[in-house]
Amino acid sequence: MSYNLDVDEADVAVLNQNLIRSKELFESIGKSLHKISTKSQTASSTINPVLKQVNQLTTNKHEVENGLKLLQEVSENASKINDLENLLNNSIENSPGGIKSYLINLNQSKNLLSQIKTQSKFKQFKGILYNFENLIDRSETKVQKYYQDLINGKDSRAIIDKRDEIKLIFQYFSNPQTKSTSNSGGNEEYVTKLYVRARSKRLIEKLKPIESSTKPAVKANANIPYEKGTNGITKYTDVLSGEIEQELIILNECQLSTHLIGPIVEESISRYNGIINKYNQVYFKTPQEIVDNVILILEVLNNLIDFKVKLKQIGLNRTLEQSNFINTFEQYLETNSVIFKEFIQAIDNRFQNLGKFNEINTQEVIVELMSKLRRLSEFKLALLQLIKNYSIGQWLVSQPPMRFVNVFSSVIPNSQPQANSDGEEDEVIQEYLLSSFYSDVIDAIMINIEIGLKKNTSGGDSLPSSSSTSASTNATSGTSSLSLNKKSTQGFILIKNLFMLESIVNRSQYLYQSLGSLGEERILRLKNRFLKLFLDDWSHASYIIIRDMTTIATQSAQHQQSQQQSSNTIGTGGGTVTNLSNKEKDQVKDLFKNFNESFEEALFNYQKYNFGDAILKKYLSNEIKKLILNTYFKLYDKYGNSDFTKNKSKYVKYDKLNFEKLLNERL
């Protein structure tokens, strides 16, 4: 039978069947998944412990590897430390490459130590670090000792020869990266202190043996003058300034700071200041001590000036200030500027104690005093410094006043130089003051002699004649002697002494230059003053002519006027007169008679003088001729051939030619 099946029903049936199959399939899958899940859980519980072990093993492996790496680094650094230790334990002298190589190794050691200390992983190796640090400290101490050996007690040449090593050591310690690992020093400040201390000590030791020679020697005889250079102050100053200059050269050669020179020389200059101060505080306290030691005082000052100039030349002005030298210098000037007053006062005192004045003892005193002045003048720079605060003539002020001051001064008015604007005023004024002082000294000597000679009486005081056979003949002996009470004799002694004094000046380069043209002019004023005294006899003879001729001429003129005569008789001028009155004839006779007596006495006295110097004799001879020749010629021209007498030869002993010839022969 055929069944008619509905199509939709067929589809539903098919779908149901498929659903049933799908359900079965899903159930089967679910079971399988459950099995898988169960098995996975079982596997997981089994694998987890294994994974933990694997991870632990991996961690352990990394730790082992890191440990091995650390050990390797430590081993490498330990090897480096060992190598450096071997190098640093060597002496610097035996180190290959010397100090340069040693400092390189030391610098490397410091860098390595610094590098290791910054890494925390090395902190556990404290023993290595401690030993390495001690090694570096010992090595730096070794460098410092080597450095001290280089600079201690060595002269400049030895230091300069080692300048490269000194520079390297300074560079090492001045490098911030090489700062000392210890607290005991080793930086730039420390090595600088070592250098300053070593060089300062050497300088002091160099000077110490000379210091005792700077003390003024005790004189066995107070009259023996101090000899320039016998005191050790010049040597001391030369050594000090020379060594300071060498220390500066060393600093420059070693490329060290020149500012170190101050601390190096400070104590030595301080000792020098002490020596200088001691002169015035201990040795030259009284005026007499100052006068007795004036050459030494000036020698010391000359050295102070030289020292000051030398240090300024090498740029150490600041050192001079800081060492208190400038104060010492100025104090020395202030204290010893009294030498000008004391020197002239000593001259005045010397003549007051001379007793009777004569040719010989005055010459002796002049030689004595001018020798002192000549030696004084050799210290021109010192004198210019000492005199700079004086005003003209201030050294002559004293209480009571010195004797010669109120008698005569050769000072030339308005001779002081004018101020200028070229910066040389002080120097010019100082030169003028020094020249004036020297001239005042000469005034003091010569005017004191003049005062002393004028105080002498004729009794027993006489002048030896030129016929004296012995230079040592006493000035008061001899029958053919002249009274020292005569002006002409006093004038002769004064001029002769002045000539001798002038010859001493001319032989002294410094004294002659300092006196200059102004000093020469002042000596000339003294010479003219004394020449007037010397020419007193000749002036009297000349005066007789001038006086009597004037009298005769005046009376004749009056007579002519009253008698209204022609002017064939004239006064003191014109040609030969005639028609003389009896009175005039007698007056002319007396004139010739008085002149002849005065002239012959002057000539007689002149021939008794002991000139001893041809230049002096020629000078005086010329001055006499200038005074007497023209005067006599006027007399002869007026009355020599007149009719005043029949016995002409009795009165007119010389014509003009014979008169001049006589003077040339006898003067």
Swiss-Prot record:
Is Transmembrane helix given among the entry's keywords?
A: no
Protein transport listed as a keyword: yes
Q: Which InterPro entries match?
A: Cullin_repeat-like_dom_sf, Exo70_C
GO MF annotation, one: phosphatidylinositol-4,5-bisphosphate binding
User: From which domain of life does this come?
Assistant: Eukaryota
The subcellular location is: Bud; Bud neck
Where are the stretches annotated Disordered?
460-483, 557-579
| SUPFAM superfamilies attached to this UniProt entry | Cullin repeat-like
Keyword tags: Exocytosis, Protein transport, Transport
Per the record, the GO terms for biological process are: exocytosis; protein transport
Bias (Low complexity): 557-570
GO CC terms in record: cellular bud neck; exocyst; hyphal tip
What family does this belong to? Belongs to the EXO70 family.
Q: What biological function has been recorded for the protein in this entry?
A: Involved in the secretory pathway as part of the exocyst complex which tethers secretory vesicles to the sites of exocytosis. Also plays a role in the assembly of the exocyst.
This protein is called what? Exocyst complex protein EXO70
Organism taxonomic ancestry = Eukaryota, Fungi, Dikarya, Ascomycota, Saccharomycotina
